Amino acid sequence: FRLPNLKYTPFLQDELVAVVHTHSKLAVSDEIAPEDLPNIPLVLRERGSGTLDVFERSLLRHNLKLSSLNVLMYLGSTESIKLFLEHTDCMGIVSIRSVYKELVAGNFRVVEIKGMPMQREFNFVQLQGQEGGLSQAFMRFAGHHSKSL
């Protein structure tokens, strides 16, 4: 949702992905169907997180509810999810950007959920009419350095 008294400026596109540790029993599949999700142990971000909101909306598009899933744990950070995945046979839903190093190192692998893209956009948010000055300088700086994200 967006508030009318705020200005939203697009910053980064992001994608949520399902990941498993390469030593997990779940690492044998390259892809699953959304209907398989209730049978897979999951670790997810906590209520109120944007990550969980995007995942939940994607589930609803496939007539699935979060309450129908086998969620073992809700955690407060992506880092804690990654640590949990290292020691369990669970699947996590995280930003592709957050697991880049683990994917390159071969510690995690992405399991595609067929037909269930989970895209989101990060925005700069400012009060309408207060778009100048330091906030503009920061937006230029962040935009320039976002190429490395």
Question: What are the residue ranges of the model-derived segments?
Answer:
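Short secondary-structure boundary segments
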Residues: 1, 22, 96-98
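Short beta-strand-centered segments that line the small-molecule binding cleft or hinge
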Residues: 1-16, 20, 109
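Short secondary-structure boundary/capping segments
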Residues: 7-10, 33-35, 63, 100, ...
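Alpha-helical segments flanking ligand/cofactor-binding loops in enzyme cores
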Residues: 9, 35, 82-83, 136
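Thr-Gly-centered strand-to-loop micro-motif
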Residues: 21, 45-46, 94-95
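Secondary-structure junction motif
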Residues: 41-63, 132-133, 149
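Hydrophobic hinge/microswitch elements
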Residues: 56-60, 64-109
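A late-sequence structural motif
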Residues: 111-149
